[in-house]
Amino acid sequence: MQKDYQKLIAYLCDFLEKEAQKRGFKKVVYGLSGGLDSAVVGVLCQKVFKKNAHALLMPSSVSMPESKTDALDLCETFSIPYTEYSIAPYDAIFNSHFKDASLTRKGNFCARLRMAFLYDYSLKSDSLVIGTSNKSERMLGYGTLFGDLACAINPIGELFKTEVYELACHLNIPKKILNKPPSADLFVGQSDEKDLGYPYSVIDPLLKDIEALFQNKPIDAETLAQLGYDEILVKNIISRIQKNAFKLELPTIAKRFNPK
């Protein structure tokens, strides 16, 4: 297994290098939250681009203090260049204008604000924006359109969350990051498990079977239940996949009009 993950690391590093070169970039930038996914992407980018891989730390007014601490520790451990931009003043303006905004609206605003900072830095420094969303999030649509889902290339987009965790172990990501509950850190008390209703250790095996059995076909709940999955779990996950499938297909562009 150790050998397989070393091959995976080499493969993902090669992907980053070739795709950046293909687009004419020598530098990359990504958002570093202090969470697992961005830590893995950060270390991979550091392996390939060295000082030309730059992390942006963008805490909001509700970000947990340990998120910033963990991000800074990672930068120190792996000699990652970084810049901190607090988005707290901007989310404060949003909150003052939209006092009745839901937590989802507030979270989406912060996610899109972070992406605006990333793309502004990208233009300023001639850097390519690297994504940090994993396959579990992408299949479930668990992300913000034009926010954390936006990027030029993504090295971990085909890795399920549990696979990203295993990869992180082989990249020597600090245990504090490995052991904390997954969270987008978009509002106080938020966690992936609370939002999704299940831990990734339960969700990922189901997602893998859905991908293997129903690629380009309607998902059949009965077949999955026969494999031993809980019926409520199956129903909830299928509902999320179907509801958010459009996020993987955007933008939908009208075909060229051809008058007869």
Curated annotation (Swiss-Prot):
Top EC group: ligase
UniProt keyword Acetylation, yes or no: no
Record-level GO cellular component terms: cytoplasm
EC number: 6.3.1.5
Entries under InterPro entries matching the protein: NAD/GMP_synthase (IPR022310), NAD_synthase (IPR003694), NH(3)-dep_NAD(+)_synth (IPR022926), Rossmann-like_a/b/a_fold (IPR014729)
Binding of Mg(2+), residues: 37, 137
GO biological process, one term: NAD biosynthetic process
Enzymatic reactions: deamido-NAD(+) + NH4(+) + ATP = AMP + diphosphate + NAD(+) + H(+)
Pathway stated in the Swiss-Prot or TrEMBL entry: Cofactor biosynthesis; NAD(+) biosynthesis; NAD(+) from deamido-NAD(+) (ammonia route): step 1/1
Signal peptide span: none
GO function terms (MF aspect): ATP binding; glutaminase activity; metal ion binding; NAD+ synthase (glutamine-hydrolyzing) activity; NAD+ synthase activity
Chain positions recorded as deamido-NAD(+) binding sites: 112
Keywords carried by this UniProt record: ATP-binding, Ligase, Magnesium, Metal-binding, NAD, Nucleotide-binding
Binding site for ATP: 31-38, 132, 161, 183
A family per Pfam: NAD_synthase
Residues in coiled coil: none
Family: Belongs to the NAD synthetase family.
Entries under HAMAP family matching the protein: NadE_ammonia_dep
Function, as annotated: Catalyzes the ATP-dependent amidation of deamido-NAD to form NAD. Uses ammonia as a nitrogen source.
Quaternary organization: Homodimer.
Full protein name: NH(3)-dependent NAD(+) synthetase
Lineage, broadest ranks: Bacteria, Pseudomonadati, Campylobacterota, Epsilonproteobacteria, Campylobacterales
